C-alpha cells in the first residue's frame, strides 16, 4: 500500500499473466488468454514437459507454458519477433525462465529441430505444413496443438494428419463477459 503526497492510499498489484499478455509489447498478433488456457490444458502442459513451439511471435504462448513449467525449444522466422518474445519472457517471468527457453531463428516449414519432444505447439499461417515434422519429433503418445483462427486452416490441419493420430479435435472457444 502506497500513500500519495496528499494522503490518499493506493494498493499496488503485480499484473497477472493475463494482464501482461493483453498489454505487453508486441510485434506479432498474440494468442489471447481465452485461447491460451485451453491450448495448454488440451496440450497437457506440465512441469518438465519438452515442447517444440513454432511461430513464437511476441511470446504469449511461451510465457503461459513456461509458467506451467515447460521446457521450450522454439523457432521464429523473424528476428524482431524473437527478440520481443525473449524480452517479454524475461520481463514477466524473470531471468530464471530463460534457462528453460531455447529459441532461435528458424523456418519450421524447412527446418527440423534436434531431439525428441513431448508436445508440439503451432501458431503459423500454414500449420499443416509442419505436421510431417511433428510426426518425426514427437515421442510415442506425444501431442500436437495447432492454433488456427479460421475453420479453413483447421480443416487443412486435420486433413494433413492422416490416420496415425489419435483423438483429433477441433475446438472453438467463445468467451463472454
Model regions: which residues?
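N-terminal auxiliary segments of SAM/dcSAM-dependent transferases
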Residues: 1-14
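Conserved SAM-binding loop and adjacent beta-strand
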Residues: 23-37
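Glycine-rich helix-loop-beta junction characteristic of Rossmann-like nucleotide cofactor-binding loops
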Residues: 41-46, 112-114, 136-137
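Conserved class I S-adenosyl-L-methionine
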Residues: 46-57
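Conserved SAM-binding loop of SAM-dependent methyltransferases across substrates and taxa
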Residues: 58-69
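Conserved S-adenosyl-L-methionine
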Residues: 67-73, 140, 165
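S-adenosyl-L-methionine
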Residues: 75-127
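C-terminal substrate-binding/active-site "lid" region of AdoMet-derived donor-dependent transferases
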Residues: 128-177
Amino acid at each position: 500500500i502506497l500513500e500519495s503526497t496528499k494522503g490518499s492510499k493506493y494498493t499496488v498489484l503485480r499484473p497477472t499473466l493475463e494482464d501482461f499478455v493483453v498489454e505487453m509489447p508486441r510485434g506479432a498478433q498474440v494468442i489471447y488468454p481465452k485461447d491460451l488456457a485451453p491450448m495448454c490444458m488440451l496440450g497437457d502442459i506440465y512441469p518438465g514437459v519438452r515442447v517444440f513451439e513454432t511461430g513464437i511471435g511476441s511470446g504469449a504462448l511461451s510465457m503461459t507454458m513456461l509458467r506451467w513449467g515447460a521446457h521450450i525449444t522454439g523457432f521464429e522466422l523473424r528476428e524482431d519477433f524473437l527478440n520481443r518474445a525473449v524480452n517479454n519472457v524475461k520481463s514477466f517471468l524473470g531471468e530464471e525462465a530463460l534457462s528453460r527457453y531455447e529459441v532461435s531463428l528458424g523456418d519450421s516449414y524447412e527446418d527440423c529441430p534436434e531431439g525428441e519432444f513431448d508436445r508440439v505447439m503451432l501458431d503459423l499461417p500454414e500449420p499443416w505444413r509442419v505436421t510431417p515434422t511433428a510426426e518425426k519429433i514427437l515421442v510415442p503418445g506425444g501431442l500436437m496443438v495447432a492454433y488456427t483462427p479460421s475453420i479453413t486452416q483447421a480443416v487443412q490441419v486435420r486433413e494433413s494428419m492422416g490416420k496415425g493420430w489419435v483423438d483429433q479435435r477441433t475446438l472453438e472457444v467463445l468467451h463472454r463477459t
